[in-house]
Curated annotation (Swiss-Prot):
Domain of life: Eukaryota
Membrane-spanning intervals of the chain: 33-53, 77-98, 113-133, 178-198, 226-246, 288-308, 320-340, 347-367
Protein name (record): Cytochrome b
GO molecular function: metal ion binding; ubiquinol-cytochrome-c reductase activity
Recorded GO CC terms: mitochondrial inner membrane; respiratory chain complex III
Classification via InterPro entries: Cyt_b/b6_C, Cyt_b/b6_C_sf, Cyt_b/b6_N, Cytb/b6-like_sf, Cytochrome_b, Cytochrome_b_C_euk/bac, Cytochrome_b_N_euk/bac, Di-haem_cyt_TM
Membrane topology (UniProt): Multi-pass membrane protein
Length: 379
């Protein structure tokens, strides 16, 4: 009799995705981050649902409801800090996952790549709205600052901002709708993940060499299930250590001050995972130009497949491109650091230089280097 996992209508979908899925035999640990992101999403949805049971999306009660969760709810402090630091782990895995895709040329699977970019935008929107919910100083002023950027859109900008706010400033209506969307978006993300996997399983996984691996495939289970479990254990250990030993390491102390529209914090900044984009935004003196640069800093990923000029898919055997890739990583770290600094000399010029370099490396240097490598290899 045929095994039930191969005949049952529901189980055979799971079987073809996680058990009998043919996978390249050469996948390195850089291929672990997809499954780690799945775990992160699961942790965020679970902790988020339990937090939502005790949270109140009202400007007068939001801050106190978070305090109540931490002090009075059984293990509420654990839920709150798992959720807050889980977001940081989510973005660490996301950026490493995207970096892996860039390094090994996974972006040539354009459908999977484009759904991935949509996922990145959706997760960023979710995280931004989640940061507003505790209604501390940085929550309120971050929401005011970032939503106000939309006023740079010609003609409809001001009306659009007031429509998003639900009034003439960030207030009760804004908090309520942000809570509603923050609850809804992770489920949309989960649906997009299914589409992402659907497109990935149409083509099969890429591998470190970038060479088609059809003649040398192995079943996903037990080889990669065991490998993924090791990844889960390492990540959950790191997350637990962060939550239990220094839960506020990645947060902002200003968010422990209740939101006050009359007092502006000395330095408004988003969470660390948005600092690189925030630095690019601040590098341009013009408001509309800054907003466009901010959007393009992520949207530029969509044109990476068009800019691929190399005859090889992966960077594994392309040392010149590797140097540029790691320069890009260094530029991103620099931008993240600058985003957290005040707007003064020398930070302004460093931020502007790093922003220009970021776009130059992706748009000009990488395609030209690939052409040069082709020439050197007489291709």
């Amino acid at each position: 009799m045929t095994n039930i996992r191969k005949t049952h209508p529901l189980l055979k979908i799971v079987n073809s995705s996680f058990v009998d899925l043919p996978a390249p035999s050469s996948l390195s640990s850089w291929w672990n981050f997809g499954s780690l992101l799945g775990i992160c999403l699961g942790v965020q949805i679970l902790t988020g649902v339990f937090l939502a049971m005790h949270y109140t999306s009202d400007t007068a009660k939001a801050f106190n409801s978070v305090t109540h969760i931490c002090r009075d709810v059984n293990y509420g402090w654990l839920l709150r800090y798992l959720h807050a630091n889980g977001a940081s782990m989510f973005f660490i895995c996301l950026y490493l996952h995207v970096g892996r895709g860039l390094y090994y040329g996974s972006y040539t699977y354009t459908e999977t790549w484009n759904i991935g970019i949509l996922l990145l935008f959706a997760v960023m929107a979710t995280a931004f709205m989640g940061y507003v919910l505790p209604w501390g100083q940085m929550s309120f002023w971050g929401a005011t600052d970032i939503t106000n950027l939309l006023s740079a859109i010609p003609y409809i900008g001001t009306d659009l901002v007031q429509w998003i706010w639900g009034g003439f400033s960030v207030d009760k209506a804004t908090l309520t709708r942000f809570f509603a969307f923050h609850f809804l978006l992770p489920f949309i993300v989960a649906a997009l993940v299914m589409v992402h996997l659907l497109f990935l399983h149409e083509t099969g996984s890429n591998n470190p060499t970038g060479i088609p691996s059809d003649p040398d495939m192995i079943p996903f289970h037990p080889y990669y299930t065991i490998k993924d479990i090791l990844g889960f254990l390492i990540m959950l250990t790191a997350l637990s250590t962060l939550v239990l030993f220094s839960p506020d390491l990645l947060g902002d102390p200003d968010n422990y001050i209740p939101a006050n529209p009359l007092i502006t914090p000395p330095h408004i900044k988003p969470e660390w995972y948005f600092l690189f984009a925030y630095a690019i935004l601040r590098s341009i003196p013009n408001k509309l130009g800054g907003v466009l640069a901010l959007v393009m800093s992520i949207l530029i990923l969509a044109i990476v497949p068009i800019l691929h000029t190399s005859k090889q898919r992966s960077m594994m055997f392309r040392p010149l491109s590797q140097c540029l890739f790691w320069l890009l990583v260094a530029v991103l770290f620099t931008l993240t650091w600058i985003g957290g600094q005040p707007v003064e000399h020398p930070y302004i010029i460093i931020g502007q230089t790093a922003s220009v370099l970021y776009f130059l490396i992706i748009l000009i240097f990488m395609p030209l280097t690939s052409i040069m490598e082709n020439y050197l290899l007489k291709w």
